[in-house]
């Protein structure tokens, strides 16, 4: 995911707000979590394109375990609006601090990268920009419009912040007509004060519901991490809340602790439990479920979009 400002190079300064916290041990990952180090020529080529365009990827910033697989298939997700977030979530490895000014040239450069990489599907995300009057909504829209001009065959997925206290911001993004609107709940409501203190659970639910009210043709999507100390019944209730908001697609993945200063992993959830959540989600009415220890919001996003389209077509066919 992409921005064109200079990267944060001093990792010790990435999370100044966490410096006072005691270290917590980082648990050894189970075998089902481990992935191979990236070595393919296509991975190196993708890495070169990212560097040539002076882009910063959330794949790197967030320490995503799937970077080798995704970049080897030339899949990329771009992070706009800088690399410094105004919030300090306990799970996230993206740098926290005072962001730089918005780069007005960024939409065109992101679109150029999408066109050059010949992406069939692209994910656009951002850091939280509580410092901006619209939370960065207009910039999201400009990126979408730029991609439509330079890569008209590419389908577009946005993964947005919550635009809390930003009246009219959501409407700006929806009016730009992304194909998929994703906003992650991240965790169950009982964990928000500790894990996602700057957000409000039911505000996020309402945001997703409002997207469907504004434009029913846009697929809606949300995801959570497990292993933060949540209970199974809380996850099932969260699924019901998402379905009440008419969300089409849900992702569930294992939380991995970025550093000793971040929220500890309470539990590594075994693969069979993820499979169980996927089956339950389908019964509850989601068009698609991606539930796997290594599942992340943008993982296999292009393939998932094709599945969503097919599932919706089949659903409408049955209703005729």
UniProtKB/Swiss-Prot annotation:
Domain Radical SAM core: 71-287
Annotated positions binding [4Fe-4S] cluster 1: 59, 64, 70, 298
Ranges where the record places region Disordered: 1-29
Subcellular location: Cytoplasm
Keyword check for Transmembrane: no
Chain residues that bind [4Fe-4S] cluster 2: 85, 89, 92
Record carries keyword Lipid biosynthesis: no
GO MF term list: 4 iron, 4 sulfur cluster binding; lipoate synthase activity; metal ion binding
Ranges annotated as biased composition (Basic and acidic residues): 19-29
Pfam family, one: Radical_SAM
Gene3D superfamilies: Aldolase class I (3.20.20.70)
Similarity comment: family membership: Belongs to the radical SAM superfamily. Lipoyl synthase family.
Protein's name in the database: Lipoyl synthase
């Amino acid at each position: 995911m992409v921005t064109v400002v200079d990267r944060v190079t001093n990792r010790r300064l990435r999370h100044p707000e966490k410096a006072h916290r005691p270290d917590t041990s980082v648990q050894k990952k189970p075998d089902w979590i481990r992935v191979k180090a990236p070595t393919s020529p296509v991975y190196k080529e993708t890495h070169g394109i990212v560097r040539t365009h002076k882009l910063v990827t959330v794949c790197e910033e967030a320490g995503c375990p799937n970077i080798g697989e995704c970049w080897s298939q030339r899949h990329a997700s771009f992070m706009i609006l800088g690399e410094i977030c105004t919030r300090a979530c306990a799970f996230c490895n993206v740098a926290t601090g005072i962001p730089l000014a918005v780069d007005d040239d960024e939409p065109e450069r992101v679109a150029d990268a999408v066109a050059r990489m010949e992406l069939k599907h692209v994910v656009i995300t951002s850091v939280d920009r509580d410092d901006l009057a619209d939370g960065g909504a207009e910039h999201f829209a400009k990126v979408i419009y730029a991609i439509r001009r330079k890569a008209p065959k590419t389908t577009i997925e946005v993964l947005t912040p919550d635009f809390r206290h930003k009246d009219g911001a959501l409407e700006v993004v929806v009016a730009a007509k992304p194909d998929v609107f994703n906003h992650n709940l991240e965790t169950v409501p009982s964990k928000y004060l500790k894990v996602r203190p700057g957000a409000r659970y039911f505000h996020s639910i309402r945001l997703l519901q409002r997207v469907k009210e504004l434009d029913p043709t846009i697929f809606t999507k949300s995801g959570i991490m497990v292993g933060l100390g949540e209970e199974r019944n809380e996850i099932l209730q969260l699924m019901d809340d998402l379905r009440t908001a008419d969300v089409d697609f849900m992702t569930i993945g294992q939380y991995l602790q970025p550093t000793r200063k971040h929220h500890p992993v309470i539990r590594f959830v075994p693969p069979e439990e993820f499979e169980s959540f996927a089956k339950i989600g389908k019964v509850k009415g989601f068009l698609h479920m991606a539930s796997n220890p290594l599942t992340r919001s943008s993982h296999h996003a292009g393939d998932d979009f094709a599945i969503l389209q097919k599932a919706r077509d089949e659903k409408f066919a049955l209703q005729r």
